[in-house]
Amino acid sequence: MISRVENISQPQFYNHNKIWTKPFIIAIIVVIILGIISLFTGVYDIRGQEDGMEMFFITRVPRTVALMLTGAAMAMAGLVMQLITQNRFVEPTTTGTIEWSSLGLLFVYLLFPAPTLVQRMTGAIIFSFIGTMIFFLFLRRVKLRSSLIVPIIGLMLGAVISAVSTFLGLLFQMTQSIETWFVGSFANIQVGRYEYLWLIVIVTLLIFMYANRLTLAGLGEDVATSLGVNYNRIVLFGTALISVAVGIVAAVIGNLPFLGLIVPNIVSMFRGDDLRSNLPWVCVIGMGTITACDIISRTIIKPFELPVSLILASVGAVVFITILLRKRKPRRLR
């Protein structure tokens, strides 16, 4: 078992066979509305312009698609991480995974002066996997009495890796690039710069296919093994999928903090922790959350644009503190 912690962090399972319920359909409609608002939000007014339609398909459509795919990826990564570690406070931001992916990007730039997007993604994915496995191995060797210790350990590990990245950046005069990676923004997304995000769809399908095994892994090593699941193999597989999702997002977008913490916890409050039935909910709410934050980032100080990571960090911090302080009673959506 990766960690033994207080009951607050333990998964709670409910049977939800129906996906297309009234609340889920309403959630999809809300996300579609947010997507439409995103398509027509920006400094450049595409209406009535000669090149309006061209700009619409070159910049607005790719940005909105990137928002949807990225929101689903990071929320999904947080959900799988929380199941594997049996801790509700774990996600790529609180495990150091994002910092490891940034370190991977730095090493790619050190090896290849002008790396391609594929090379950047490969470096980010490999380092994300290594960093996440180091975090998981540490949890397996240390008995923790409180669930709160787990994210603290992850944040400390992330701080160390961030310091290493900063040192290497200063040493090789790459501090500006590092600052860019640590700030997630969709401002530069356009045709030709986001297409690899479609790989997230494959990751989502794989997670859905292995959802039952990942859910059993969330019960702990002893229970999962007794039910015929190869615990170590499924944890390794889940970690690989998380690393692919986080690595792609890090290379294309940058750091998007707390999204994997906010969404899975909101969903689990109402639906428990069954991965197969929760995955559509997590993806949809993840899409809506990041799209709403991006719309705010584009309009709050218009005509200027804030990095969406700043909005996410602010919202995520409030939600994180609320989760720590609130005694939650799961309710079921009907």
Curated annotation (Swiss-Prot):
GO terms for biological process: siderophore-dependent iron import into cell. It is found in: Cell membrane. GO terms for cellular component: plasma membrane. CDD domains: TM_ABC_iron-siderophores_like. Keywords: Cell membrane, Ion transport, Iron, Iron transport, Membrane, Transmembrane, Transmembrane helix, Transport. Disruption phenotype: A mutant lacking both fpuB and fatCD permeases is incapable of using petrobactin as an iron source and exhibits attenuated virulence in a murine model of inhalational anthrax infection. GO terms for molecular function: transmembrane transporter activity. Its main location: membrane. The chain crosses the membrane at residues 24-44, 64-84, 98-118, 119-139, 152-172, 197-217, 234-254, 277-297, 304-324. It is a multi-pass membrane protein. SUPFAM superfamilies: ABC transporter involved in vitamin B12 uptake, BtuC. InterPro entries: ABC_BtuC-like, ABC_transptr_permease_BtuC. PANTHER family: FERRIC ENTEROBACTIN TRANSPORT SYSTEM PERMEASE PROTEIN, PETROBACTIN IMPORT SYSTEM PERMEASE PROTEIN YCLN. Belongs to the binding-protein-dependent transport system permease family. FecCD subfamily. The complex is composed of two ATP-binding proteins (FatE), two transmembrane proteins (FatC and FatD) and a solute-binding protein (FpuA). Part of an ABC transporter complex involved in ferric-petrobactin uptake. Probably responsible for the translocation of the substrate across the membrane. This is Petrobactin import system permease protein FatD. It comes from Bacillus anthracis. The gene is fatD.
